[in-house]
């Protein structure tokens, strides 16, 4: 058995996430206390009580998801004291920060401050209504990229996430995204507009990438205890000098999730823990590598299942 740890990204948030884990785990509660102190505000109250409209704001959702994922991991480690480190870890977009905290490369406090700044910068990079994101299904990647070139007409539109076979997310100017969507539908594919606050992971995020680069100059990065498969190149990295470069490139670069999962399988990974809110990654993994066994751990009941899963 070879295990990977996977950490979810933005969109997995919900009011009350992790509440039963906090109730059962002093270690998880300590994580939330550290996050509140680091941000000098009661983010934990927003996570647990809402309102949902405030939690979904990018500058709140990003630190909230990292906090919850790290709290769940703390509860797992508390419950399974002899838990072995994974062979590899990966996070979907924002989740890469959670993975770096799990590996000891980033301090929790630095991570939540970083993603607070990252979230604000991503929100401010594009005015409301200017950008859009759509999920595309039923079109091959090469053909979709050709559609993006055809539909751009001087605007930005490109693949943002290669999530799973048959599911690619595009991002860019709203008009260009709409034109690509029309081409997709004409080609018998499907295009679903996603409700997000900004067109993440495309060239419009270049100003946000510069902000993240500046913020990272103030943050120490240690050598991760295990390699992290980076979003932008789907390759394992354990070099602290490259962590910052990869995080900067990630802001306006493509999330290569399908390729990342395939890289983990090629490295021998047979089992994975999805650590944090939701079960989005387990669903994607099932479409990428159906033989890879995944346990989604986002509540207290799942924490209790970890020992049996990793021991079996």
Model-identified regions with their sequence ranges:
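Post-His helix in hydrolase/transferase enzymes
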Residues: 309-312
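Non-catalytic positions within long, well-ordered alpha-helices that form the structural scaffold/packing
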Residues: 265-268
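Alpha/beta catalytic cores of group-transfer enzymes, especially the acyltransferase/condensing modules
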Residues: 10-12, 39, 103-253
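FabD-like malonyl-/acyl-CoA
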Residues: 1-144, 194, 271-305
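Short loop/edge segments at beta-strand edges and connector loops
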Residues: 230, 258, 298
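A short, well-structured juxtamembrane/interface segment
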Residues: 255-263
């Amino acid at each position: 058995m070879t295990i990977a740890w996977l950490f979810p990204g933005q969109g997995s948030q919900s009011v009350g996430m992790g509440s039963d884990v906090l109730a059962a785990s002093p270690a998880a509660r300590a994580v939330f206390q550290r996050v509140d102190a680091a941000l000098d505000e009661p983010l934990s109250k927003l996570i647990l009580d809402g309102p949902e409209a405030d939690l979904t704001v990018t500058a709140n959702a990003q630190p909230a998801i990292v906090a919850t994922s790290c709290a769940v991991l703390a509860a797992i480690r508390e419950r399974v004291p002899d838990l072995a480190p994974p062979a590899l870890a990966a996070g979907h977009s924002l989740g890469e920060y959670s993975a770096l905290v799990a590996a000891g490369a980033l301090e929790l406090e630095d991570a939540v401050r970083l993603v607070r700044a990252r979230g604000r910068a991503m929100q401010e990079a594009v005015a409301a209504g200017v950008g859009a994101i759509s999920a595309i299904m039923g079109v091959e990647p090469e053909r979709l990229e050709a559609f993006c070139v055809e539909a751009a007409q001087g605007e930005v539109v490109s693949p943002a996430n290669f999530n799973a076979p048959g599911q690619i997310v595009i991002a860019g100017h709203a008009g260009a995204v709409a034109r690509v969507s029309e081409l997709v539908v004409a080609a018998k594919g499907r295009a679903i507009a996603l409700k997000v606050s900004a067109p993440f992971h495309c060239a419009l995020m270049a100003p946000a990438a510069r902000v993240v680069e500046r913020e990272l100059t103030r943050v120490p990065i240690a050598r991760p205890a295990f390699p992290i498969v980076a979003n932008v190149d789907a390759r394992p990295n354990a070099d602290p000098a490259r962590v910052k470069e990869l995080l900067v490139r990630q802001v306006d670069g493509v999330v290569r999730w399908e390729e990342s999962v395939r890289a983990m399988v090629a490295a021998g990974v047979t089992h994975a823990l999805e650590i944090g809110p939701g079960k989005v990654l387990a669903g994607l993994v099932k479409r990428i590598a159906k033989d890879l066994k995944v346990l989604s751990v986002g509540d207290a009941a799942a924490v209790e299942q970890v020992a049996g899963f990793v021991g079996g």
